[in-house]
Amino acid sequence: MSDELPAGATTHVDGVGYSLSATVLESRDANAHADFYRRLLGWTTIDEEPGWVILRPPGGGSGLSFSTDELYEPPVWPAQPGAQQMQDHLDIHVDDLSAAVERALACGATLAEYQPQDDVRVLVDPAGHLFCHFES
């Protein structure tokens, strides 16, 4: 990957350097899934091929990768016994929670029925992955 990471993004443990490149999200259509986050976050596509897309923020750093899995099943949340379980979610800091939620909905997200915190909004992307918007 040719994008440079920001200074300090690499840690060294026992002589080995580590830097998080991306979090990978699977769906039945990686290209459509990536398009949602491209529009939502304003990130740049740095690699795209059938079934695989990599997005990075304009300033560099770790990003999101998207992989097609034809057997992907969206999670059920809150969790229910016997249903597909959520394995991860994205926490996205925003500086205006109401405006960010409105924008996410306009991009194609839905508001999750269950909202466990007053200062966080749980949303669902078009592929069924949960993500949270929060202010600090």
Regions found by a protein language model. Give the residues of each.
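Short glycine-/small-residue motifs
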Residues: H133
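Vicinal oxygen chelate
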Residues: S2-S21, W43-D91, V101-D125, S136
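Conserved active-site tyrosine of GNAT-family acetyltransferases
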Residues: H33, Y37-R38, A104, G128
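Conserved Rossmann-like nucleotide-cofactor binding loop
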Residues: D95, H129
